[in-house]
């Protein structure tokens, strides 16, 4: 698989990060014999080797880069992180490869006790695989909460949340097979007759 990058770090022979060169800078160069060092002019954008993935993503987005240089505390170039690498990391953090239902809620910011939601799930033998929040810039002061759980049956999860006063905006997963549900109801009716 080919992944296109538009920004490459420029380093000295001592592995000191000198700058970042963009594809546009190379294409705009009038002289094909121009030295790379003359094309880089600004302070190099980099991230510490100890930085969190959130910080790396913020720097990439703030500077509209496709790669981000990683440097040691002494400024030595260690490597680079690509947008694609961060995307893969977030996919793992959000448990996208795990089987289960995805539920999107809208809750008032003042009621945003996520521990209550998690406790509610745990009481009902549902394990939270991932949870993320997103602030909505609306007058009502709501936030979006997206939760991935280890069960696939959406109807049970929706009922649980609705019953506890949560507004389910969307739910993705599998609903129970109506035939299975009908069979269980019939078995229950036979049980009651006995």
Per-segment meaning from a language model:
Residues 9, 132-137, 143, 171:
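Structural preference for solvent-exposed beta-strand-turn elements
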Residues 1-6, 13-18:
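A positional/architectural concept
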Residues 1, 19-65, 73, 77-139, ...:
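Tandem CBS (Bateman) regulatory domains
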